[in-house]
């Protein structure tokens, strides 16, 4: 694809949009945001860039993420972001290590809640349905454990 560029262009923001999308599509999102190219006039520009979807079978409640170098194969191109995507559901299954020796706990989210009873090894299986949209994923920090 050939794109004509004016010789007077001194800033990235003066480049044609097609070329700018190509350049920004090669950068990580954090770097794109730090360039401040996404100004008020280009606020929705990142919705047209390809995004990476992180596939990892276990989501950890303490927000630890796997080492990026070892988990690079779990990053796969996902669908492009747009406002008309339908919300999707996914099931998150996680082990919670509880500091108590007996009793039951109630796991509550904004969407669904389920009663958990831990076993001899003091761990529970958390299985909840979380509604996903193209913009937000319910944070695991929002899951509250309450002792019954």
UniProtKB/Swiss-Prot annotation:
Q: What is this protein called?
A: F-box protein At3g55900
List, alphabetically, the PROSITE patterns matched. Answer: FBOX
The record ties this protein, via Pfam families, to: F-box (PF00646)
Identify the residues that the record assigns to the F-box domain, covering every copy.
9-59
Q: Where in the sequence is the signal peptide annotated?
A: none
Top-level lineage group: Eukaryota
Taxonomy of origin reads: Eukaryota, Viridiplantae, Streptophyta, Embryophyta, Tracheophyta
């Amino acid at each position: 694809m050939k794109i004509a560029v004016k010789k007077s262009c001194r800033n990235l923001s003066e480049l044609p949009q097609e070329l700018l999308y190509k350049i920004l599509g090669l950068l990580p999102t954090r770097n794109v945001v730090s360039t401040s190219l996404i100004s008020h006039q280009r606020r929705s520009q990142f919705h047209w860039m390809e995004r990476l979807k992180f596939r990892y079978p276990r989501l950890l409640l303490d927000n630890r993420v796997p080492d990026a170098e070892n988990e690079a194969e779990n990053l796969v191109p996902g669908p492009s972001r747009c406002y008309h995507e339908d919300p999707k559901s996914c099931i998150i299954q996680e082990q919670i290590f509880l500091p108590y020796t007996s009793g039951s706990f109630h796991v509550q989210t904004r969407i669904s809640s389920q009663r958990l009873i831990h076993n001899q090894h003091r761990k529970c299986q958390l299985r909840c349905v979380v509604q996903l949209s193209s913009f937000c994923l319910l944070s695991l920090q929002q899951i509250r454990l309450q002792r019954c």
